[in-house]
Regions:
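WD40 beta-propeller repeat fold
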Residues: 1-156, 166-189, 195-215, 219-274
């Protein structure tokens, strides 16, 4: 198996080989160059193997590309002239990609147009930074959730990306904090459930099916506080959750990591009567 990562030591993507089951060795095998200039954010990445091992990557709208991992050949290059910074990229299927700008705009593109347009639809107002999570579903009807650094959540129907179908506000302790680790994700096996992290040392689980367009504060079904009780970073205050993901086979199991190096695997229980 191959893994692709983005990050140090430079702007390139690193390709890793995962050894067979009887070994725990992961070795670097190659690198994929990107168009990220010095000082630009690391590329956001997403992968698909539905047609061939492809990686979607880019840090701004005008440098979004799809590269075939083994040959390193570009099969799609954005035709956008905009330098809007990206916060997330995703494959909806082998022919459709979705990107989210840090200001909250969503952009759809057809990978069958090698230099197709990738223009941002109007985004939310305000100076907040946003991230995106794409749920599971039939092509072009997957639910999309966006989370802002101010704690706002917007749910979007991809058939009309310019307007959210529902919105709410997270009950987080420190909205407006750094957006570096913001994350929102859909449960793969629980309809309407999302998880939110990146504000502090907690992960919140929400049920979204009752949300409307009012934007009122939503109460979480469950809050995982395990990281918040970990050791303090040296002179940097309490740990912050840096990433989380849902277990694919266990509906109520999540994995989360924090800035103190802790990694938790945990289950959540819905409130009684829910």
């Amino acid at each position: 198996s191959l893994l692709v990562t983005s990050g140090p030591p430079d702007s390139s993507l690193q390709v890793w080989q995962v050894s067979a089951e009887d070994s725990d060795v992961i070795k670097s095998v190659s690198a994929i160059s990107t168009e990220n200039g010095t000082g630009q954010p690391w590329a956001k990445i997403a992968a698909t193997s539905s047609r061939a091992p492809w990686v979607l990557h880019g840090s701004r709208l005008n440098n979004v590309q799809i590269t075939e991992v083994e040959s390193k050949k570009n099969v799609y290059v954005s035709g956008s002239r905009s330098s809007e910074e990206l916060s997330a990229v995703a494959f909806l299927d082998c022919n459709t990609l979705l990107v989210c700008c840090s200001k909250g705009q969503l952009c759809l593109a057809d990978t069958r147009q090698p230099q197709g347009p990738l223009e941002a639809a109007p985004g939310p107002a305000g100076g907040q930074r946003w991230c995106m999570g794409v749920g599971h579903g039939p092509p072009n009807s997957q639910p999309v959730a966006r989370l802002s650094s101010g704690g706002q959540l917007a749910l979007t129907d991809l058939r009309k990306v310019s307007e959210p179908v529902a919105c709410a506000r997270c009950s987080v302790s420190s909205p407006g904090s750094s957006a570096e680790f913001l994350a929102v994700s859909w449960a793969p096996a629980l309809e309407g459930c999302i998880a939110v992290s990146g504000f502090d040392g907690t992960v919140h689980v929400y049920e979204t099916r009752s949300w409307d367009g009012s934007g009122r504060e939503a109460e979480p079904l469950f809050v995982h506080k395990g990281h918040a009780f970990g050791g303090l970073d040296a002179g940097e205050g309490p740990p912050v959750v840096t990433a989380h993901t849902w277990h694919l086979q266990k509906p109520r199991t999540l994995l989360s990591a924090a800035s103190d190096g802790s990694l938790h695997i945990w289950d959540w229980v819905p409130p009684r009567g829910s």
